[in-house]
UniProtKB/Swiss-Prot annotation:
One of its GO terms (biological process) is cell division. Signal peptide: none annotated. Keywords: Cell cycle, Cell division, Chromosome partition, Endoplasmic reticulum, Meiosis, Membrane, Nucleus, Transmembrane, Transmembrane helix. The chain crosses the membrane at residues 13-33, 48-68, 72-94, 99-116, 132-152, 172-192, 205-225, 235-255. The gene is bqt3. One of its GO terms (cellular component) is nuclear membrane complex Bqt3-Bqt4. This is Bouquet formation protein 3. Connects telomeres to the nuclear envelop (NE) during both vegetative growth and meiosis. This connection ensures clustering of telomeres to the spindle pole body (SPB) when cells enter meiotic prophase. GO terms for molecular function: telomere-nuclear envelope anchor activity. Its main location: endoplasmic reticulum. The keyword Cell cycle applies. The keyword Endoplasmic reticulum applies.
Amino acid sequence: MSGSKCCSSSNTIKVSIYLFLHTLTYGLLNYHLNPRLLASTGVVESDIPYWMSYLSIIMHVGQSLLLQKFNLGYGWLLLTKYPVYVLLSTYYLTPLSQIAWAFIIDAISLLVARCFSRANPIKCSNQVNTQYSVSFLFTIMASVLISVLNYISQKIFLNGLILGNSHNVVTSLVAPPLPLQYLAHVPIGYVIQRVVFSERPIPQSLFLMIFLTLWNCFIPYSILFSMNWSAMFQVVGAYLSQIWIITFICWALSL
C-alpha cells in the first residue's frame, strides 16, 4: 500500500515538474522568439495588448491540465490548435515561416520538459489496434474530405461575405490549391481517424474537440480581430462543422 502511494507521489512530482518546465519554456520562447504570428494579418504590434502574451501562457497551462485530466494524446494538440494556422494562412495569407516558428516553439517546449522531467504525463488513450492499411485509408479519406469541404467553404465565405458576389469565382491566390490543402490536412485526418477508432465515446470526443478548438482559436484571436469578430467566428465555426461531419462519416464507415 505504501509502495503504491510512493509511486503515485513520485508520478505526481514528475507531472508537476513536466508541466512547470513545459509552461516556462513555452512562455519564454513565445515571449522572446515568436515573431508576432499575426503581424502579417494587418495587426500592428503596438495594437497588441501587453497582457496578450500572459493570457496565452495561462491558456496553455489550462489546456495542458485538461489534456492530462482526460488522458489525451499529443495528437489532440494538432487537431485543436493548428487549424487556426491553416485558417490564418488561407484567409489572412500569413507566411509559412511564421507558422513554422509556432511549430518549432511547441516542439522545443515539449522536448525540454520531457528530457528534464523524464515524464510523459499526457499519454495516448487506449485505442483499438487497427491495421496500417485501414488507418492509412481513413487518414487519406479524412484529409481529402476536409480539404474539399474547406475549399468549398472558402469560396462561399469569400464570395458571399467578403466580396459580396456569389457568382464570380475567387482567384486561387486567396485560397490555396487543393493539392496543398491535402498535404496540410493529412495530420488532422490522421488524428480524426484515431479519434474514431479510440475507445473514448464519440460524443465525448466531439465535445472535447469543439471545446479545445474554440479555446485555442476563437478566444485569443477574437480579441485581436475584434473589429471582424463575426467573420472569424464564421471561419472557425465552418472548420469545426467540417471536422464533425468527417468524424461522423469515418465513424459510420467503420461500423
